[in-house]
């Protein structure tokens, strides 16, 4: 059950800590909208990967089991056509190490080819040539 009133109150909160405190007071771990989205992704066999640059971070939706070139094609068809390789950081490694540079220095940035099956939460940079 999702309460529209509760979801509305959560949506109006700008501060992450305030939202978390509100959820705890309501006896919830996460909002109903988050649970709904997660359930829909699971039901539809979808997952998310990320791209990040100096000024932007984006989340992209793909099907579970998609390989790196297909993921690149979600961003732009030229990326899929001219796919060379992908640099990949696992989400948990990025959370623990905090920066791309720290992940690279710790050897946590992998270089993957056309057969790499993208994992949920991967942070990816694509190299391509068209």
Give names to the regions the model predicted:
Residues 1-119, 129-130:
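C-terminal-of-GTPase-core extension/linker across diverse P-loop GTPases
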């Amino acid at each position: 059950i999702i309460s529209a009133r509760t979801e509305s109150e959560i949506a109006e909160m700008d501060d992450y800590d305030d939202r978390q405190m509100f959820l705890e007071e309501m006896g919830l771990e996460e909002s109903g909208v988050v649970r709904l989205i997660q359930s829909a992704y699971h039901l539809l066999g979808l997952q998310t990967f990320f791209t990040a640059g100096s000024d932007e971070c984006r989340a992209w939706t793909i099907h579970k089991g998609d390989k790196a070139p297909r993921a690149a094609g979600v961003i732009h068809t030229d990326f899929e056509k001219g796919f060379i390789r992908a640099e990949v950081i696992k989400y948990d490694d990025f959370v623990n190490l905090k920066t791309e540079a720290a992940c690279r220095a710790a050897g946590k940035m992998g270089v993957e080819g056309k057969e790499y099956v993208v994992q949920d939460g991967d942070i990816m940079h694509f190299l391509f040539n068209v």
